[in-house]
Amino acid sequence: MVKKTIRVMVEGGKATPGPPLGPTLSPYKVNIPQVVKAINDATKDFEGLSVPVEITIDIDTKEFEVRVGIPTTTALLMKEAGAKQPTGDPAHQKIGNISFEQVVKVAILKRDSLTAKTLRAAVKTVLGTARSIGITVDGKDPKEVQKLVDEGVYDEILSRYEEEWSKGGQ
């Protein structure tokens, strides 16, 4: 039982049998439309975002398995803010504003790829990313929000999401 794993980036919910997917899959003689449908079904919640996808193909049986990764923190924050691209000058040019709860939700989604051990630490990491791309949080500079997190201002919101964090964002 020989397996081959292929990693590609696709736009959520919009994979097509054309390049790069079709030509990459055709040597393995899998049912490409089935693979595309499986990818689109699995990535539909990330529409408009570039999503890492891993396709594992059993060379003998032509069966396949699709695993979807999580988009980058930057991509998730930009989607939350409704922005198209990060700013080149985050100190002076803001591209959007999101709520603290949106930051928490991004932190939970990114749980497995962040080195943070606690929800509080993960939120502070995501706030750092928000600051670097020009997104404000509740109308404030994310650095200021990080200080408020340290001071306990957001403890009530964090405690509401603590259980979801401990389950791994499932």
UniProtKB/Swiss-Prot annotation:
Alphabetized InterPro entries for the sequence: Ribosomal_uL11 (IPR000911), Ribosomal_uL11_C (IPR020783), Ribosomal_uL11_C_sf (IPR036769), Ribosomal_uL11_CS (IPR020785), Ribosomal_uL11_N (IPR020784), Ribosomal_uL11_N_sf (IPR036796)
Entry annotated with the keyword Protein biosynthesis: no
Pfam family, one: Ribosomal_L11_N
Gene Ontology molecular function terms on file: large ribosomal subunit rRNA binding; structural constituent of ribosome
Domain of life per record: Archaea
Keyword field: Ribonucleoprotein, Ribosomal protein, RNA-binding, rRNA-binding
Signal peptide: none
PROSITE patterns assigned to the protein according to its UniProt record, in alphabetical order: RIBOSOMAL_L11 (PS00359)
CDD domains the UniProt entry points to: Ribosomal_L11
SMART domains per UniProt: RL11
GO process terms (BP): translation
GO cellular component terms given for this protein: large ribosomal subunit
Keyword Ribosomal protein in record: yes
Record's function text: Forms part of the ribosomal stalk which helps the ribosome interact with GTP-bound translation factors.
Quaternary structure annotation from Swiss-Prot or TrEMBL: Part of the ribosomal stalk of the 50S ribosomal subunit. Interacts with L10 and the large rRNA to form the base of the stalk. L10 forms an elongated spine to which L12 dimers bind in a sequential fashion forming a multimeric L10(L12)X complex.
Recorded family membership: Belongs to the universal ribosomal protein uL11 family.
Family matches, as PANTHER family: 60S RIBOSOMAL PROTEIN L12, LARGE RIBOSOMAL SUBUNIT PROTEIN UL11M
NCBIfam families tied to this protein: PRK01143.1
Protein name in UniProt: Large ribosomal subunit protein uL11
Upper classification of the organism: Archaea, Thermoproteota, Thermoprotei, Desulfurococcales, Desulfurococcaceae
Name of the coding gene: rpl11
